[in-house]
Amino acid sequence: MGKSVAILGAQWGDEGKGKIVDLLTDRVKYVVRYQGGHNAGHTLIINGEKTVLRLIPSGILRDNVTCLIGNGVVLSPEALMKEMGELEARGINVRDRLKISEACPLILPYHVAMDHAREAALGKNKIGTTGRGIGPAYEDKVARRGLRVSDLFDKEAFAEKLKDILDYYNFQLVHYYKVEPVDFQKTLDDVFAIADVIKGMVADVTTLLHQARKEGVNILFEGAQGTMLDIDHGTYPFVTSSNTTAGGVATGSGFGPRNLDYVLGIIKAYCTRVGSGPFTTELFDEVGAEIARKGNEFGAVTGRPRRCGWFDAVAVRRAVQINSISGFCMTKLDVLDGFEELKICTAYKMPNGEIVEYAPMAAKDWEGVEPIYETMPGWSENTFRVTKREELPQAALDYIKRIEELVGVPVDILSTGPDRVETMILRDPFAA
């Protein structure tokens, strides 16, 4: 009997999901993206060679894996072609191994233009989007005016719909935001050129998944961003536009929740966040700067520096609740090497003096929140590239154990470096 495993971020994204997905894909037949778009940057380092995937599932680097893009993903045809070209230039067969749901909403140039115009108008109050049109494309989906992959293959009807939508967007862009309009004919010509290339990759992803389940093969669902950026459960409004949580697997692929056997939450040994929004344990001192330097904390897609802070058990407890997390993979343990002491946030002190152990939902409810820390001894030994648990310093083992106690879920995988081999699998999600 095959197993179905979801891998998702349990913090604010950038936890190291891509590496872990790639590591576990030697056990699976299918890897599935079910939400987000090319705003996700999944960095893989294999034999010293770095690959950043934004849209195509991380399983594409394994020859025996078929990659699926589910209906919950907003698809930029332009970004897809660029990423395919980069992979094919390295001899990777993409076209025969990538299937795309016909129900994926399309990201088109007017979505990108609107994204940039809005962020510029918001100034210092901006959300901190990646500027790739993700939010506007999801808006069109919910407003039922969006174009989908299936629309690409009726060119006459597509052109009519595009004209109506572009009139709507260009009116706002020109008259409200005072920026240049998006050209209809260029948009049409560009997208039709790409449509002819991807036509053979379009499939009924939901049916493929259910057939795979019947055949008893292993399936891996690859989440993007992180739990605290979920449109419903994150620090709203400083969130992404999709459901980054385990529930997104069902809605974004058509694979029902009872079919999931294991949910692997990815956590860093500390916390990071990109862009605006609440971050209770953020460090503004030399310690924070040192974590950022040692952890190379810059966004894989945007290049933006990440905000760094101590591990926040309060926020991660919320992630455990929302996702029914079975076990954790802790990444970047080695970044904490050499610190004399480490801190873990165990509770929040609210502005009214109340002590809480679960994170608030809305961003406004985080205002004035103070972290309550527990201090633990650090370690001077090197954990980089350690692949046996018994070779870790006792202080590192104690740190991991304390986090397990605080969040109520075991750490089943430990990552001590960027390469796929620099990992300890303590409990295999596909054998659990």
Swiss-Prot record:
Listed InterPro entries: Adenylosuccin_syn_GTP-bd (IPR018220), Adenylosuccin_syn_Lys_AS (IPR033128), Adenylosuccinate_synth_dom1 (IPR042109), Adenylosuccinate_synth_dom2 (IPR042110), Adenylosuccinate_synth_dom3 (IPR042111), Adenylosuccinate_synthetase (IPR001114), P-loop_NTPase (IPR027417)
Cofactor(s) needed: Mg(2+)
Signal peptide segment: none
GO annotation, cellular component aspect: cytoplasm
GO biological process terms held by the UniProt record: 'de novo' AMP biosynthetic process; IMP metabolic process
Catalytic residues in the record: D14 (proton acceptor), H42 (proton donor)
Binding of GTP, residues: 13-19, 41-43, 306, 332-334, 415-417
Compartment(s) where it occurs, according to its Swiss-Prot or TrEMBL record: Cytoplasm
Assembly mode: Homodimer.
HAMAP family given in the database record: Adenylosucc_synth
Protein name according to UniProt: Adenylosuccinate synthetase
Gene encoding the protein: purA
